[in-house]
């Protein structure tokens, strides 16, 4: 288990969330302006909600289908405050919104999900630790904090396995399949040469 999990559970994220629901006509603040934010905004509009996007990019896909956009870095507290003042509830398009921004917004408006959930989802070791702690079956896994640790992790788990970057990998990026003949130094480089996780390969019939 990685040492980060106890910190997650005791991080003390506070929020302005009384558990209330929001009727059509409310404004949903979406952190992130990509394709997922665009789909969220379009679905929300069909249900009668308005959306306000916060994104560092001026012409993001989500901002093209919403009436309001705040264009600013995720660490701009003045812009975050103006954004919070303009919306009723905040959600996140993707998991890699900085912790500090999520926590800042949660002190001003309800957030869905809560910041600690975002914190867990941002890092694969935290995800696996959290799921294991709560009794959810996961494949065998080991942290790979440095290149030298990869050899021992492969020895313990054995190929086939998947080496993944702990953060920011998606759609197959930052992932390398480890077979018996894989050059581990090359695999480490292709993964990104950063904190990683080695997961035993799962023989599954389908993904639902």
Which functions belong to the PLM regions below?
Residues 94-95, 165-166, 200:
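Short secondary-structure boundary segments
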Residues 119-160, 167, 171, 175-178:
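Glycine-/Pro-rich loop/turn segments that contact NAD(P) or position catalytic residues
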Residues 137-139, 160-163, 176-208:
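Conserved ATP-binding module of the ATP-grasp superfamily
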């Amino acid at each position: 288990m990685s040492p980060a999990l106890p910190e997650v559970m005791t991080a003390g994220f506070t929020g302005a969330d009384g558990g209330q629901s929001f009727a059509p006509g409310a404004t949903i603040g979406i952190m992130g302006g990509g394709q997922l934010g665009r789909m969220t905004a379009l679905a929300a509009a069909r249900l009668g909600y308005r959306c306000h996007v916060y994104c560092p990019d001026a012409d993001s896909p989500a901002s093209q289908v919403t009436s309001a956009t705040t264009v600013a870095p995720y660490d701009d507290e003045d812009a975050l405050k103006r954004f919070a003042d303009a919306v009723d509830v905040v959600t996140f398009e993707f998991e890699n919104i900085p912790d500090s921004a999520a926590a800042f917004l949660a002190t001003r408006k309800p957030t869905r999900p809560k910041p600690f959930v975002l914190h867990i989802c941002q890092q694969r070791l935290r995800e696996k630790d959290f799921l294991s702690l709560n009794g959810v079956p996961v494949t065998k896994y080991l942290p790979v904090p440095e290149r030298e640790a990869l050899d021992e992790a492969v020895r313990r788990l054995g190929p086939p396995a998947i080496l993944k970057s702990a953060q920011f990998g998606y759609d197959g990026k930052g992932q390398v399949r480890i077979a018996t003949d894989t050059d581990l130094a090359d695999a480490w480089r292709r993964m990104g040469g950063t904190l990683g996780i080695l997961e035993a390969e799962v023989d599954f019939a389908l993904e639902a």
